Amino acid sequence: MPHTFIDLFAGCGGLSLGIEQAGFTAVFFNEIMPVYASTYLKNREIPQGHYFIGDINDLNKQLDNYRSIWETIDGGIDLVCGGPPCQGFSMANRQRVIDDPRNNLYKAYLFFLRAVRPKFFIMENVKGMAQRIDEIKDNFREYMGDDYAFGYRILRAQDFGVPQNRERLIFIGNRLGIEPNDIFARIEAKKRLGFVLRDALEGLPQLEARPEKNKSELEDIRYGLTERDFDYPRTAFYQFINGDRVITKLYNHKNRYNNPRDLEIFRRLPQGGNSLHESISDIMPYGRRNSIFKDKYFKLREDEICKTITSHMKFDCNMYIHPWEARGLSPREAARIQTFPDDYVIYGAQNSWYAQVGNAVPVKLAEAIGASIMEFLA
């Protein structure tokens, strides 16, 4: 019998994919954004009706319509995972987080956990959530009682091979009597030597910046294609994200429009250079402003890990300038930095590709967490 899991706030599927690579099988997911759900569905087999596209609060009102999915599984659901958006946990003021209306989604996640009662759960979030740990413990006990033991750690994606500076707060709980510290010890044991940005970018076709606005839907090999045949170099990083599979298509490797001034900035900046660098002082549009604009432009260093991939890339990639080409990173390059395999296709408009990838959990971080939990179920 396969080990089963449910993903809430599933996004385009980064957390799910890592859990699947650890050996679990998805039986249900929830995502509010239809285009994210489309990407999730088109990259895996999910039975019709085994998902809810909409607000989790609406799902919780209709749980009786879905209970048969998990109640007919021998032994019940093994794992529920998810990352509820909780902007309130990043607030600088001292207002109690439990009173912040933006945290209703967090409570909805706990409501679902109480209804399904999985053997394990994973909740990932911004590391600022750790500052409110006392309230969080109270909320867990309010919803879950004393049946679940849970703990938390701030994990760095780079420690698990991800070529990116990304820290996430990971909560793990279980009702099997397992000490949470033992689970995190298994996760820590999976740390490995990592990769740098060059490893994720090398071997992909060169692109030019698109010179025309509002033409991202056009297909032109100079600026990149939604899909093309491609013979990937079999590098160590290729093996890391793809395993032994032979992939012959390149997806989502398209560049976006940049104005002539930005392109000149991209060309002049050295690797590691930002908005305050002297090489662009005569054309820098924020030159008269203070240092808060220093990262408006940033050329990435190929010999270091990448800065955190975020959904801001849907607006521009000026903070993610390619280290040796005068352009921003492509969505496929961002996906590689998030350790998505090369045949994981992102659907929707190009700006949405960036947002979906930027909001995802790094796949190989998720796999390390999932594999550690699997060791207690095997």
Residue ranges and their predicted role:
Residues 2-117, 127-131, 138-140:
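Core alpha/beta nucleotide-donor-binding catalytic domains of modification enzymes
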Residues 31, 124, 333:
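Acidic-residue sensor for enzyme active/binding pockets
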Residues 43, 186-190, 323-327:
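Short Gly/aromatic-enriched secondary-structure transition segments
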Residues 65-74, 87, 91-285:
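Class I S-adenosyl-L-methionine
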Residues 227-378:
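C-terminal target-recognition/interaction regions appended to catalytic cores
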